[in-house]
UniProtKB/Swiss-Prot annotation:
A motif (GXSXG) lies at residues 75-79. Belongs to the patatin family. Tuber. Its EC number is 3.1.1.-. Probable lipolytic acyl hydrolase (LAH), an activity which is thought to be involved in the response of tubers to pathogens. It comes from Solanum tuberosum. The keyword Coiled coil applies. Residues 1-23 form the signal peptide. This is Patatin-04/09.
Length: 386
């Protein structure tokens, strides 16, 4: 319901936009959005590795990183973790992880993160290893230090409100300048799987703020693309570099949205006759998968409609596998065999057509996006030099 309301607000704002001028490439706002999905984050990690490799090839720069090209990078749950990995600075003020480092991260730490350690009356996993490895990797880095704008969602179960961590909102809400490891654990703390996360922040005036957070998917229903676009819109309105954007116009947005795969068309479907026999526990197990599959589809439908309404459909690319089956549908199967299957899913996805109406493959579309991102970066650098 919340997603539908957000879309309608965006849709009517866009229809009210009267500007018909073509966007200059250097003035476009670039957005990367990464879905949640636990260990299935391996799938978008494969896509990110390919894209970063293309950017390095186009610009002849092996040190090129995704954060150099996107104005906003947003994620929820495992997508929030990927967001942090590619935007958190190291000692040289460069992303501490290249895209090619993400899949090895899952293989090294996934089996320990998803190693049953809970109880029948509590979460499936105690989350201790996850928090420990996040602290080790992200250190004391805070939101304001991110190398580009970020949008990472969580949900506060004490205030019953979404919490969105962004750099651009810190002037108004300095309490949100939390440590990245706290944010990453919070956005990944999926109910049933991990315990909620409690932490406090302190502002410069001495005020203390308390957070009691769970998975960002509760706030964005797994797909943070609408959230990322909202943050990009605010950025466009506030950043002098985008002063030519007077109102919400998707002709001036370039959005890449990465999914973690769904099984909506194949495995784990049910009949009304089967579901009529379910009790509360059985429904609880099935409803999350149903909700995630439906929301992923509907968010893509909403955004596609909006971009098409502005004759800007080439500015939006959704990369999603809709035919997961077997163990690859599970967000917490971190066995080596399943992770290898997820790698294969990502690599195979690159060769698939973007849609049944277009012969263009995801690989070709990402190469096109890489060229646009590269050209835009060069144009903005030239403009800044004058």
């Amino acid at each position: 319901m919340a997603t539908t309301k957000s879309f309608l607000i965006l849709f009517f704002m866009i229809l009210a936009t009267t500007s018909s001028t073509c966007a200059k490439l250097e003035e476009m706002v670039t957005v990367l959005s990464i879905d949640g999905g636990g260990i299935k984050g391996i799938i978008p990690a494969i896509i990110l590795e390919f894209l970063e490799g293309q950017l390095q090839e186009v610009d002849n720069n092996k040190d090129a990183r995704l954060a150099d090209y996107f104005d906003v990078i947003g994620g929820t749950s495992t997508g929030g973790l990927l967001t942090a990995m590619i935007t958190t600075p190291n000692e040289n003020n460069r992303p501490f992880a290249a895209a090619k480092d993400i899949v090895p991260f899952y293989f090294e730490h996934g089996p320990h993160i998803f190693n049953y350690s809970g109880s029948i009356f509590g979460p499936r996993y105690d989350g201790k290893y996850l928090l420990q490895v996040l602290q080790e990797k992200l250190g004391e880095t805070r939101v304001h230090q991110a190398l580009t704008e970020v949008a990472i969602s969580s949900f506060d179960i004490k205030t019953n409100k979404p919490v969105i961590f962004t750099k651009s909102n810190l002037a108004k809400s300095p309490e949100l300048d939390a440590k990245m490891y706290d944010i990453c654990y919070s956005t990944a703390a999926a109910p049933i799987y991990f315990p909620p996360h409690h932490f406090v922040t302190h502002t410069s005036n001495g005020a203390t703020y308390e957070f009691n957070l769970v998975d960002g998917g509760v706030a964005t229903v797994g797909d943070p693309a609408l959230l990322s676009l909202s943050v990009a819109t605010r950025l466009a309105q506030e950043d002098p570099a985008f002063s030519s954007i007077k109102s919400l116009d998707y002709k001036q947005m370039l959005l890449l949205s990465l999914g973690t795969g769904t099984n909506s068309e194949f495995d784990k479907t049910y009949t009304a006759e089967e579901a009529a026999k379910w009790g509360p526990l059985r429904w609880m197990l099935a409803i999350q998968q149903m909700t995630n599959a439906a929301s992923s589809y509907m968010t893509d439908y909403y955004i596609s409609t909006v971009f098409q309404a502005r004759h800007s459909q080439n500015n939006y690319l959704r990369v999603q596998e809709n035919a997961l089956n077997g163990t690859t549908t599970e967000m917490d199967d971190a066995s080596e065999a399943n992770m290898e299957l997820l790698v294969q899913v990502g690599e195979t996805l690159l060769k698939k057509p973007v849609s049944k109406d277009s012969p263009e493959t995801y690989e070709e579309a990402l190469k096109r996006f890489a060229k646009l991102l590269s050209d835009r970066k060069k144009l903005r650098a030239n403009k800044a030099s004058y």
